[in-house]
């Protein structure tokens, strides 16, 4: 299996005391920007949670920006990030660049009200959680109950942030439901579509 290793760019800054180099993500963090790119898993979630907590401790009054380009991933990892976004004192502004699908859409909708954005050509997709199990029937029943419980949690969170009726939301999330940025705005997932910096 071929591994895809991406080169992480470095930025060099000149100061009165000399030069300093940062990897691009650390440089963005200095400006209170967290970039979530790629699939969501426990490792990614732990890094994002740590960044949110660090930025809160650095300045509990100043907004944090979470940029999202994600196809989704592990529901429990996303819920850990979502809960931390709600827990920290600073508002967390969310901005979709590219796509926010599945768990990524949950995080996008979970941004501070009035501070949830998407770029003009972004796509947003919501759906119910997927799961699979194997083994003894009793174990599969346990997994099914847990997946149904997670589905209920996700539906309630999305209904709370979008203002959609829970029955409509459940019907829409029954299968993959794709939206343009404008459609996501009308749906209540975001508050504004950006085409350029203001």
Curated annotation (Swiss-Prot):
The active site is at 102 (nucleophile), 127. One of its GO terms (molecular function) is ATP-dependent peptidase activity. CDD domains: S14_ClpP_2. It catalyses: Hydrolysis of proteins to small peptides in the presence of ATP and magnesium. alpha-casein is the usual test substrate. In the absence of ATP, only oligopeptides shorter than five residues are hydrolyzed (such as succinyl-Leu-Tyr-|-NHMec, and Leu-Tyr-Leu-|-Tyr-Trp, in which cleavage of the -Tyr-|-Leu- and -Tyr-|-Trp bonds also occurs). It is an enzyme of class 3 (hydrolase). Its EC number is 3.4.21.92. Gene3D superfamilies: 2-enoyl-CoA Hydratase, Chain A, domain 1 (3.90.226.10). The keyword Phosphoprotein does not apply. GO terms for biological process: protein quality control for misfolded or incompletely synthesized proteins. Its main location: cytoplasm. It comes from the Bacteria. InterPro entries: ClpP (IPR001907), ClpP/crotonase-like_dom_sf (IPR029045), ClpP/TepA (IPR023562), ClpP_His_AS (IPR033135), ClpP_Ser_AS (IPR018215). The keyword Secreted does not apply. It is found in: Cytoplasm. It holds the Pfam family CLP_protease. GO terms for cellular component: cytoplasm; endopeptidase Clp complex. Keywords: Cytoplasm, Hydrolase, Protease, Serine protease. Fourteen ClpP subunits assemble into 2 heptameric rings which stack back to back to give a disk-like structure with a central cavity, resembling the structure of eukaryotic proteasomes. Cleaves peptides in various proteins in a process that requires ATP hydrolysis. Has a chymotrypsin-like activity. Plays a major role in the degradation of misfolded proteins. Belongs to the peptidase S14 family. This is ATP-dependent Clp protease proteolytic subunit. The gene is clpP.
């Amino acid at each position: 299996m071929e591994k895809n290793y991406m080169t992480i760019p470095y930025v060099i800054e000149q100061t009165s005391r000399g030069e300093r180099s940062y990897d691009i993500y650390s440089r963005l963090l200095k400006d209170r920007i967290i970039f979530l790119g790629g699939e969501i898993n426990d490792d990614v979630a732990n890094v994002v949670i740590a960044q949110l907590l660090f930025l809160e401790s650095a300045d509990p009054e100043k907004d944090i920006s979470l940029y999202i380009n994600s196809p989704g991933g592990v529901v429990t990892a996303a819920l850990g990030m979502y809960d931390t976004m709600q827990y920290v004192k600073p508002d967390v502004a969310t901005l979709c660049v590219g796509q926010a699908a599945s768990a990524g859409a949950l995080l996008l909708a979970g941004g501070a009200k009035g501070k949830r954005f998407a770029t003009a050509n972004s796509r947003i997709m919501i759906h119910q959680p997927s799961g699979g199990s194997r083994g003894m029937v009793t174990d599969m029943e346990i997994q099914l109950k847990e997946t149904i419980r997670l589905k209920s949690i996700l539906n309630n969170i999305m209904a709370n942030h979008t203002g959609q009726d829970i029955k409509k939301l459940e019907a829409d999330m029954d299968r993959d439901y794709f939206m343009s940025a404008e459609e996501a705005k009308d749906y209540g997932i975001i508050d504004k579509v950006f085409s350029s910096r203001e």
